[in-house]
């Protein structure tokens, strides 16, 4: 009886406190648009600091100024180590309730897919990868395509890219990959020789480089580019049976890409063009849409294939594993505040709901730790309490404390004295399991070893042959322009790799390099004219007298 009375008293007190803090009042001579400081104090003079006389020294008790400037000093959180430059929008995913002509429940019990016409709120963040927060959106770079779906079972994050494959398959190489693509730690200049030094010694990257240096490496904007989950995931049905699955987002606006020359011309006019394009389209009611497709494959090793189906450097070809529609993604609302929503939006490949699961893709499993870890560093331990990241459903947890906690995620009626589980004193209880667990059988020796079926060049050659002649020409031009800045050993290794992919591919790169005089310019990706540009700025600039 004592415990019941105590719990009711705490609930009453908590309710009273919440009501008191949620009720906002305005003081005398205040209206809704009255400027205040963060303490709620009205600001009567926002133009002048407090001084001894109007020309005298400032006083230390300038609280409004000290609060204002101190907050300004801390306005920026650490930018993302990759995908720093981004844009985002709100919208929804609408399910078709089927996988092609079959009920989707045959393959997955995830609730958001089951009912035709069911809409799930979504937030999508697009990005470039290797450059800083305010870098141009015209650079040759993969584009991030990260989707957060606020489902009835909690959040699901699908953290993908526009290109359907990746450079590497082992997460141990990821920091080195990023270091190679990002600026030189001494000069702070992106260096094509550093990039191809790494790529030439990582033959599994040949396929991705083939896409990146073609027009597919510079999407025209975010609305007219594809999205992909890149990795093989799993769908799990009510019986606990699983299939491998890949996700694809195809823009209903069509797909458009840029050549290097076109991108440079656009960059000279507006280096925020993709962000502006997305924002303006939504403001004008021209809501971008993507048809969402899935491919499935039985959850086994597939020895009949010449590649490992879990290898993220490989495509699953449509002819073998058809794309089937499962829904559509629509973006219909711009963010109200960029920092609060787009910058603080936090995604993780480990954020899955019931009916979805991981595959044994090594890179996927490495990302699953890295993404959530970087959000805790970048945004804080309580990043999931921010509105953009918080699920749109009941949350109750015994996690507490940490930097910037501003609420306790407690269940209604929970005994506030019990912040652990199990308990018989009014604490939280475990949920009931929906469907059967998926229990894959795994056995083997623990070792450091690459997968058996690497086939690093087969699909790179197939992609080269499937390109149009225009795409092949642009690919060769861009590769030659950057490789011409590299030492001969790197050029020779890349020619060897391209030749293994397709003899014509290697031959054309070799012929192109013969026509370009070798130089040691540390040029950025896709151009050999960077040193000339630096000299041009000095030679063609206009002198001015000091003042």
Swiss-Prot record:
The biological processes this protein is annotated with in GO are: hydrogen peroxide catabolic process; response to hydrogen peroxide
Positions with biased composition (Polar residues): 34-59
Q: What is its EC number?
A: 1.11.1.6
Give the enzyme class: oxidoreductase
GO MF terms listed in the record are: catalase activity; heme binding; metal ion binding
**Basic and acidic residues bias: start-end ranges:** 537-547
In the UniProt entry, which residues are flagged as the active site? 83, 161
Extract the CDD domains matched here.
catalase_clade_1
Cell location: Cytoplasm
Essential cofactor(s): heme
UniProt region (Disordered), positions on chain? 1-59, 511-547
Record keywords: Cytoplasm, Heme, Hydrogen peroxide, Iron, Metal-binding, Oxidoreductase, Peroxidase
Pfam families, alphabetically?
A: Catalase, Catalase-rel
| GO CC, one annotated term | cytoplasm
Q: From start to end residue, where is composition biased (Low complexity)?
A: 527-536
Name the residues that bind heme: 371
- Family that this chain belongs to: Belongs to the catalase family.
Q: What the protein does?
A: Decomposes hydrogen peroxide into water and oxygen; serves to protect cells from the toxic effects of hydrogen peroxide.
| Record's protein name | Catalase X
What is the organism of origin for this protein? Answer: Bacillus subtilis (strain 168)
């Amino acid at each position: 009886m004592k415990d019941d009375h105590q719990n009711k008293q705490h609930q009453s007190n908590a309710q009273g406190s919440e009501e008191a803090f949620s009720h906002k009042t305005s003081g005398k001579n205040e209206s809704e648009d009255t400027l205040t400081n963060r303490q709620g104090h009205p600001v009567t003079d926002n133009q002048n600091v407090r001084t001894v006389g109007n020309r005298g020294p400032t006083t230390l008790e300038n609280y409004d100024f000290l609060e204002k400037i101190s907050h300004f000093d801390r306005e920026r959180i650490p930018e993302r180590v990759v995908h720093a430059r981004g844009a985002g929008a709100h919208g929804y995913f609408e399910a078709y309730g089927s996988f092609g002509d079959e009920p989707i429940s045959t393959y997955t019990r995830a609730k958001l897919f089951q009912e035709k016409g069911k809409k799930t709120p979504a937030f999508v963040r697009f990005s470039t990868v290797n450059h800083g927060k305010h870098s141009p959106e015209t650079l040759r770079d993969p584009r991030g395509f990260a989707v957060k779906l606020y489902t009835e079972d909690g959040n699901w994050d699908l953290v993908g890219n526009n290109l359907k494959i990746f450079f590497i398959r082992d997460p141990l190489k990821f920091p080195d990959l990023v270091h190679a693509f990002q600026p030189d730690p001494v000069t702070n200049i992106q260096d094509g020789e550093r990039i191809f030094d790494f790529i030439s010694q990582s033959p599994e990257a040949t396929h991705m480089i083939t896409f990146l240096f073609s027009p597919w490496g510079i999407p025209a904007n975010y609305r007219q580019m594809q999205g992909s989950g890149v990795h093989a995931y799993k769908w799990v049905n009510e019986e606990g049976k699983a299939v491998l699955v890949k996700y694809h987002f195809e823009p209903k606006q069509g797909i458009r890409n840029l050549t290097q020359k076109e991108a440079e011309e656009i960059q000279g006019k507006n280096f925020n063009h993709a962000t502006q394009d997305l924002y303006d389209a939504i403001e004008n009611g021209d809501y971008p849409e993507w048809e969402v497709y899935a491919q499935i494959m039985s959850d086994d090793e597939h020895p009949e294939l010449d590649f490992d189906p879990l290898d993220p450097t490989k495509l699953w070809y449509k002819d073998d594993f058809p794309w089937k529609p499962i829904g559509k993604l629509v973006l219909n609302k711009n963010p109200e505040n960029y920092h609060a929503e787009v910058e603080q939006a936090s995604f993780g490949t480990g954020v899955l709901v019931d009916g979805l699961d991981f595959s044994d893709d090594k890179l996927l499993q490495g990302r699953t730790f890295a993404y959530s870890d970087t959000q805790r560093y970048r945004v804080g331990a309580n990043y999931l309490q921010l509105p953009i990241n918080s699920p749109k459903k009941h949350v109750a947890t015994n996690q507490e404390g940490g930097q910037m906690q501003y609420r306790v995620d407690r269940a209604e009626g929970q005994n506030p004295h019990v912040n652990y589980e199990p308990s018989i004193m009014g604490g939280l209880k475990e949920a009931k399991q929906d469907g059967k667990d998926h229990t894959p059988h795994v056995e083997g020796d623990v070792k450091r070893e690459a997968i058996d079926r690497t086939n690093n060049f087969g699909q790179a050659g197939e992609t080269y042959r499937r390109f149009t002649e225009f795409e092949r020409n642009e690919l060769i031009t861009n590769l030659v322009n950057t490789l011409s800045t590299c030492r001969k050993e790197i050029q020779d290794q890349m020619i060897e790799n391209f030749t293994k992919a397709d003899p014509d591919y290697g031959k054309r790169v070799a012929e192109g390099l013969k026509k370009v005089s070798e130089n040691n310019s540390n040029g950025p990706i896709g151009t050999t004219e960077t040193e000339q540009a630096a000299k041009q700025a000095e030679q063609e600039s206009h002198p001015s007298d000091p003042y």
